[in-house]
Amino acid sequence: MEIKENTANEEKRSISFVEQLVEEDLAEGKNGGRIQTRFPPEPNGYLHIGHAKAICMDFGVAEKYKGICNLRFDDTNPSKENNEYVENILNDIHWLGFEWGDIYYASDYFQKLWDFAVWLIKNGHAYVDEQTAEQIAEQKGTPTTAGTASPYRDRPIDESLQLFEQMNTPEAIEGSMVLRAKLDMANPNMHFRDPIIYRIIQTPHHRTGTKWHCYPMYDFAHGQSDYFEGVTHSICTLEFVPHRPLYDKFVDFLKEYDGTAEQGLNDCRPRQIEFNRLNLTYTVMSKRKLHTLVDEKLVNGWDDPRMPTLCGMRRRGYSPESVKNFIRSIGYTKFDALNDVALLEAAVRDDLNKKAIRVSAVLDPVKLVITNYPEGQTEMMEAVNNPEDETAGTHEISFSKELWIERADFMEDAPKKFFRMSPGKEVRLKNAYIVMCTGCTKDADGNIVEIQAEYDPESKSGMQGSDRKVKGTLHWVNANDCVKAEVREYDRLFFVENPAADERDFHELLNPESLQVRTNCYVEPFAASMQPGQYLQFQRTGYFMADPDSNSATPVFNKTVGLKDTWAKQNKK
């Protein structure tokens, strides 16, 4: 007997494992049914698309479950942080379309963290170690062998308190002392083997100036900041899985410190949940390597359109919706994977197809003369802005005797399946007339410098004569009414699929042809008037956006992505 389930009234749902865990906590009434997340960037660089995945999760969970997502800058290392990064992080989150609740800084809690560290020392849970970094590392042991206790591990509490105070003075020498948590040197989790929780840094802080000379380590500040703010779900990437026991241990200490441990260690505390990072083919996400690319001028700054940074993608012409759609499509799992950058580009194409204005631009021009078109005459043709969006309207493009077309759209001796322009064949000039090629002119070196054709006056778009079947349709611009432009075409920054896993120096993996600049391009005036932030499709070529380097004399355009995936074709060969 076959049993059929009646699912007609069931809501079809597809949620991530993170959302499942959040829903379990809500069902159990944890944290009073309250949801609070946070996005905690360190202001030591620009956000990249990997951060966008975390942003979508942090803000998405809060929005879905009617909670709040705050923004917290983990600014515990003044030697690498500044306000430039803070401002750009704010801009990038806004660009993605998210709104935070409150803005916090780990530096807001420096005094509270200091007081907590003093409490740890007084209760025998921390000590000042005067060994070198190398000595401490040697004593850590291995995952299968216990570590060796520091000779300072059992120093008197009063002595550690006095030295800890000395660490926070202008005279303290960086590296001379650290504060370590006194945990378990035999724990198989290496992070538990008396981790360093404070170190001396004499660089002025971008917010607190020279008030502090001793700063908390990330593992000491992060969970405590979550706890201070009332975060319910601390969502992070998989590399923090081994850090979770330490995160929980410090929260346990905090609950003892503030007197809430008696109410239950599991009450009102943040829960750390880890998901897989976003890794892309032909891309590096390492902040260190991205810094190197910028510092060594291997790219033109953090917003170079070849960079995986959000500001670079924005400048290149990616839409925030395409980035978010891509992230939704790859999902969140417990396993790291390498995602094909072609999937991101497909998401960009799909979104820009719906919103990009179609314009005419010729990147490799050759002159086309319509020999039977009246001398000195100009006509205005109507061009649809976006066939996918009726509300986008139209604009006018001028037509005259002399035009520019793409050099690749002409062949003097064309094969049978070449449906573009060649002698004796008809093609349609988009939004204009059907023309027949009658010949071409070459220079002394045999290069084609001009193409001739005749037009059919009855074949104008919209007229009855335009209905006849012509296989080829070409784009063009009026040679007497166009604007010379610069076009920057971008390719993969690295020529190997997984540069992060390649053992060679990553400098050797850079694609020398990742940027091609064309300076002899022509665009219609309507295209030249476009500003950065307006999405364009150069017909039959790809998606583009005006660059901030544009000026009234020479507009500059960045190629966002081609109409088709050219790399897929290359890989099939």
Annotate each predicted stretch with a short phrase.
Residues 1-13, 572-573:
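Basic/polar N-terminal segments that are highly enriched at the extreme N-terminus
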Residues 40-43, 72-80, 102-111, 134, ...:
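Conserved short loop/turn motifs at secondary-structure junctions
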